[in-house]
A protein has these predicted regions:
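Short alpha-helical segments that sit at the start of domains
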Residues: 1-21, 78-105, 112
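Short acidic, hydrophobic short linear motifs in intrinsically disordered regions
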Residues: 29-42, 111-125
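Short, cationic-aromatic polyanion-contact patches
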Residues: 10-17, 66-86, 154-171
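Short amphipathic alpha-helical interaction segments
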Residues: 43-57, 128-145
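A short, conserved structural fragment
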Residues: 56-66, 144-154
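Short amphipathic alpha-helical segments that mediate assembly, nucleic-acid/protein binding
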Residues: 16-18, 35, 48, 73-74, ...
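Alpha-helix N-cap/helix-initiation sites
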Residues: 13-14, 31-32, 45, 94-95, ...
Length: 171
């Protein structure tokens, strides 16, 4: 296996990185994982140590000596993109707006477009009523708090962490 990444990354790297991240994001097993434990659990070929190094460099995990755990942004991204079965109506609504706003900003960034103002976001969703605007504004605040978007001077853009998560989780 190659030790150096190409600018686009290797398919083998993306496969093991995704497998390691999915293991850490599994709702039933979210806890710190030892490097050896990850290697024993995964059936995907590849270098777990290098995968953990790449994931840490992308700020998708945290490391303490031999232990690794998914970063808050990765956990929140995973929560947002999961089905909403069994959630309360208010949680379902929150998740809907979080997902819609994040997908809009990710699509914009994939197309090479720059940041979007709050007004442009409202217009993109056809938010003419105050209630809808507040829901979008709250979603922007939650996404910023989770580290999935960056906001400066009233403009929002998907963070590098969110772009990398989107790239990894949609192979």
């Amino acid at each position: 296996m190659h030790k150096h990444r190409t600018p686009e990354g290797l398919a083998e790297h993306a496969t093991i990185d995704r497998a390691v991240l999915e293991l850490m994001l599994d709702l039933d097993r979210q806890r710190p994982w030892a490097e050896d434990e990850i290697a024993r659990t995964l059936s995907v070929p590849g270098d777990v140590r290098e995968s953990l190094r790449r994931l840490r460099a992308c700020k998708l995990i945290h490391r303490w000596n031999d232990l690794a755990v998914a970063a808050h942004a990765a956990v929140r991204f995973h929560e947002i993109t999961q089905p909403t079965d069994g959630l309360s109506p208010s949680d379902t609504s929150e998740r809907h707006w979080d997902k819609a706003v994040l997908e809009g900003l990710l699509a914009r960034s994939t197309d090479g477009e720059g940041p979007r103002t709050a007004q442009q976001t409202y217009e993109a969703f056809g938010a003419t009523k105050q209630k809808k605007r507040l829901q979008i504004h709250d979603a922007l605040d939650r996404l910023e708090g989770a580290g999935l978007i960056e906001r400066r001077s009233g403009r929002s853009i998907a963070s590098e962490v969110a772009r990398r998560l989107d790239e990894l989780m949609t192979l």
